[in-house]
């Protein structure tokens, strides 16, 4: 009889999904203030990060990449090559871009947080919606991040959670994993679904 509470607890725990239901990731209501700072250098770098995330990645204005990326732009995502010209050639061919909403609350990329280290590193976390492999036809949200090191107000180096896909059946090269560094087939440095 002494073990009844322990057995009841064990049976209760066994009936609960081990992974549980994670809270959905949501963006902040107004992301614009996250890209500002009292320090003028950090403010310039946060603004550049905002333009990379919104103008380039979300809305495809790759013709403006030279405003926000250094010429050497070092890419640590294994699915993409380094160099601003390489990025512009690869993603600029997609067209001139879509109109950017003037109200940041209407941006397609939902910003979760912007963090910094010193005044040259800026990290932007955003919502990423992915297909749920456990439940076909359903999705879940997680957090995508892009981190840059800035030099003179331009991104000089980039990191994200990029992964390499397996090679396609029948040969060929693998590419960036879905959502791993370029969710939704977006450009290097992120992209959002």
Where are these regions (language model features)?
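Generic short beta-strand segments
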Residues: 92, 124-131
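A solvent-exposed, acidic/Ser-Thr-rich amphipathic alpha-helical stretch
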Residues: 62-121
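Short, cysteine-centered beta-strand-loop-beta hairpins and adjacent loop/turn segments enriched
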Residues: 99-103, 129-140
């Amino acid at each position: 009889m002494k073990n009844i509470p322990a057995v009841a607890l064990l049976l209760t725990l066994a009936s609960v999904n081990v992974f549980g239901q994670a809270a959905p990731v949501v963006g902040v209501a107004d992301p614009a203030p996250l890209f500002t700072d009292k320090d003028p250098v950090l403010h310039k770098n946060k603004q550049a990060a905002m333009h990379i995330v919104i103008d380039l990645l979300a809305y495809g204005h790759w013709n403006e990449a030279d405003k926000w990326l250094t010429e050497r732009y070092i890419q640590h995502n294994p699915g993409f090559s380094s160099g601003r010209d390489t990025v512009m050639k690869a993603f600029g061919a997609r067209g001139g871009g879509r109109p950017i909403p003037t109200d940041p609350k209407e941006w397609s990329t939902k910003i979760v947080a912007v963090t910094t280290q010193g005044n040259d590193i800026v990290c932007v976390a955003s919502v990423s919606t992915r297909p749920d492999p456990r439940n076909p036809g359903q999705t879940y949200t997680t957090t995508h991040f892009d981190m840059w090191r800035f030099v003179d107000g331009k991104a000089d180096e980039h990191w994200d959670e990029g992964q390499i896909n397996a090679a396609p059946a029948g040969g060929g090269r693998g590419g960036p994993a879905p959502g791993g560094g370029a969710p939704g087939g977006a450009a290097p440095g992120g992209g959002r679904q």
